[in-house]
């Protein structure tokens, strides 16, 4: 199936694993193909993890962050987006943290109230409270006044730091230009020729209106069964049907002579 451009990397990866796919086409609301993402693209997304602004560049929704972390937004609007700022782990003393945390940043903290207050005082955009820590009413009220989103998660900070980048929507990583697609009425011989000239393993297939309907892979073409035919009366290539070389000849029945046809397997020849 096609995926929506706002689907998170985590959900896209789960969908690809469910269907054992290496390529996931991305469609818009009316089913028109918009782009695609591969498992290689998802793997490369982790290579940018050293950039602590990559999350904001991907602009995930707070709801998507919460779903990725199997957590809950307890303060703030879950439908808003994290669009600017860096990602921090609040593991230092507050006097050190306040020198680094800036406005609109996202910070992961534990159960220490002074750390939580430091994050709110810095006007961070989001605070993720780890290990299922209960957030006090006073902290929630202060965060509400400062427009700081609070997300609580059962995971530890290390796990959150690993998973949070999976909340980025796949539109941030998808390929949009130079896509190789096929129409459902294209001939397999033509498709094979194109496939041999590219490194991709799977290709989107669309109908005449450009709507995505499925994918075709190299493996699919390897499993194509040739048409089986029996030649009667004439067995010269020039007298046979077009593209006879692409068919599997089972038997030849002819009362003339043996022609010049070649096959990859033994055939039954009856001269009568």
Where are these regions (language model features)?
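A short, polar/charged loop-to-alpha-helix boundary motif
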Residues: 39-56, 160-161, 219-231
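The conserved cystathionine-beta-synthase
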Residues: 2-20, 27, 46, 117-121, ...
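A glycine-centered beta-loop-beta connector
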Residues: 16, 24-42, 195, 203-219
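Feature captures the catalytic cores and cofactor-binding loops of soluble hydro-lyases/lyases
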Residues: 88-173
């Amino acid at each position: 199936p096609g995926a929506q451009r706002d689907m998170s990397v985590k959900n896209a990866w789960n969908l690809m694993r469910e269907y054992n796919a290496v390529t996931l086409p991305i469609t818009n609301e009316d089913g028109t193909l918009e782009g695609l993402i591969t498992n290689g693209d998802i793997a490369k997304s982790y290579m940018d993890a050293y950039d602590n602004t990559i999350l904001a560049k991907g602009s995930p929704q707070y709801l998507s962050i919460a779903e990725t972390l199997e957590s809950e937004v307890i303060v703030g609007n879950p439908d808003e987006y994290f669009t600017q700022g860096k990602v921090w782990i609040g593991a230092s003393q507050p006097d050190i943290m306040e020198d680094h945390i800036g406005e609109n940043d996202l910070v992961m903290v534990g159960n220490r109230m002074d750390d939580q207050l430091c994050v709110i005082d810095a006007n961070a955009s989001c605070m993720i409270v780890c290990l299922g820590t209960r957030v006090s009413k006073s902290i929630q009220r202060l965060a509400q006044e400062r427009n700081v989103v609070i997300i609580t998660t059962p995971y530890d900070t290390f796990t959150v730091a690993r998973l949070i980048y999976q909340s980025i929507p796949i539109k941030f990583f998808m390929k949009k230009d130079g896509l190789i697609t096929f129409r459902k009425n294209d001939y397999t011989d033509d498709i094979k020729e194109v496939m041999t000239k590219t490194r991709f393993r799977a290709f989107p297939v669309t109908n005449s209106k450009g709507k995505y309907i499925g994918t075709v892979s190299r493996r699919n073409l390897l499993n194509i069964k040739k048409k089986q035919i029996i030649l009667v009366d004439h067995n010269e290539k020039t007298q046979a049907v077009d593209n006879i070389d692409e068919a599997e000849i089972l038997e030849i029945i002819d009362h003339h002579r043996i022609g010049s046809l070649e096959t990859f397997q033994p055939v039954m020849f009856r001269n009568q």
